[in-house]
Amino acid sequence: MQEKKMRILMLGNSFTTANHMPDMLADLTGAEIVQHTRGGARLAEQLNPKTKMGKRTLEALQNEKWDFVILQEMSNGPITSKASFLENAEKLCEKIRENGAKPVFYATWAYQRGGKKLETFGMGYDEMYQKMYEAYHQAADRTNALIADVGKKFYELSDRENLYADDGCHPNEKGSQIVAEVIAEVLMN
């Protein structure tokens, strides 16, 4: 008898889709991956039935079976809109569990140290990393969800490896490979 293929729904934005990261994740896990993404999307949009993406996500959670649903918030959303991030994370995790799936937070990273984007954001690298770390871990703790802490991995590697695209915000191909590896490790254990 053939083993059932793992099914993963990814909810996010360009940090999820950059460099075809879901394909990298599929290669590492053998899973079928469906993505509901839009550049700049926030988790709140995934819950809004009045948006095209929200309608698709809510229908997918109601009508399809998933093993894991991966949640990725807009790049600085966990800091700039923390209360909204936590509230929407809780609502999504509830819907994910009703589906029988496991929620997984894909915790993203601080903008590149010394980069224009970080300078414009008005926060130091270590401070942004710490605030992102705290927000994602708070969301995971509150919802008893898994966490793929990519932000921590970027923080550990950033002094020795370039993981960022030229904008100092998105991952380059190496960065996306790290994303896929960190998520795969969480899903496979």
Predicted segments with their positions:
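Serine-dependent acyl-ester chemistry module
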Residues: 68, 74-77, 81, 111-131
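General small-molecule cofactor/ligand-binding pocket signal
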Residues: 34-36, 104, 146-148
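Early exported N-terminus immediately downstream of N-terminal targeting peptides
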Residues: 100-103, 108-111, 121
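A short helix->loop->beta-strand "cap" motif at the edges of active sites that frequently abuts
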Residues: 94-104, 145
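Stable alpha-helical elements in mature extracytoplasmic
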Residues: 21, 53, 57, 85-92, ...
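Conserved SGNH/GDSL esterase-like catalytic core that processes O-acyl groups on lipids
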Residues: 5-11, 15-90
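Catalytic His-Asp segment of secreted/periplasmic serine-dependent ester chemistry enzymes
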Residues: 116-117, 121-189
